[in-house]
Amino acid sequence: MRALVTGVGGFVGRHLVHHLQEEGDEVCGVSRSAGALNMAATPVSQTDLNDLSAVERLVQETRPDAVYHLAAQSSPAESVTNPWGTICNNLLGQLNLFEALLSADLHPRVLVVGSSDEYGQVRPEDVPTNEDAPLRPITPYAVSKVGQDMMGFQYFAQHGVAVVRVRPFNHTGPGHDARFVMPSFARQIAEIEAGMREPVLRVGNLNVARDFTDARDMVRAYRLALVEGTPGDVYNIGSGRSVLISRMVQELIALCSAHVEVRVDPALLRASDIPRQEADTRKFTALTGWQPRIPWHTTLRDTFEYWREKVREEKLCAS
């Protein structure tokens, strides 16, 4: 299968490319950044998805059988400070991709990656959350993901594009950048252990619970969704278990050799937060048989070890 992966230079994109190649797929990546051009054994096109003519050239040159659309501004916090950029980037790039496929008369299967944040302020009776729960987004990022989700359905319904939509819950692992909760804590703790910052871990609201899946399991689910999913349908992907952020913090601290004080930073508290997210994945599991394979403690350890090594390298470079 010839697969086109947008956002190939991102955290999930790199894991997905590795998995697709293991499955024997021929992969072409797309990235706005030149930094992704050096990916081993993967041709990468530096293409701005907001440029329709560039996207048209891309699909004509690659003629994919499968499209994994991962490219997006993916930080909810960043979307609050830059709603214009988030919504324009996330919607226009996908719109251009669909229009380019129609213009080229190509008919690949397309995976549109939404987010559990689409569900937003979930009612207590809707946890665990299934695909029929109402969408009540509370950040510009979440609004953009609802837009991508609905656009995917519209192009399926109106134009017959073989779109499969997924709503992944939180996913993390080694290589995840420090804008996000687990890698942010892991980096801070690694810096404390290395003597590069005061022994204080700055945190936001620790009394919320999130459903975490290892990214290496998530990308397996993405390929299964694209290959086995029903065009026009939508699937939740997650572990089906929620973890308190306070528990995550304590387990990360236990992995390091330093004393760490936990301190709430008011700047990290959100005006509105979702108390608990937990996926009901029965629909996707019944279709594909997918289950997470990597235990929570392994994801936690691997993420911390990634940042421990990265911090060591940074310390060496600075000395």
Task: Tell me what each language-model feature is.
Residues 3-22:
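N-terminal Rossmann NAD(P)H-binding glycine-rich loop of SDR-like oxidoreductase domains
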Residues 41-51:
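Rossmann-fold cofactor-recognition segment
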Residues 49-89:
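NAD(P)H-binding glycine-rich loop region in Rossmannoid oxidoreductase-like domains
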Residues 81-99, 103, 109, 117-165:
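Catalytic helix-loop patch of NAD(P)-dependent Rossmann-fold dehydrogenases
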Residues 122-128, 150-211, 215-223, 240-242, ...:
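NAD(P)-dependent short-chain dehydrogenase/reductase
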Residues 184-185, 228-269, 314:
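Mid/C-terminal beta-alpha module of Rossmann-like enzyme folds, strongest
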Residues 215, 234, 247, 266-291, ...:
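Conserved C-terminal active-site "lid" loop/helix of NAD(P)H-dependent oxidoreductases
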Residues 296-319:
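Amphipathic terminal alpha-helices
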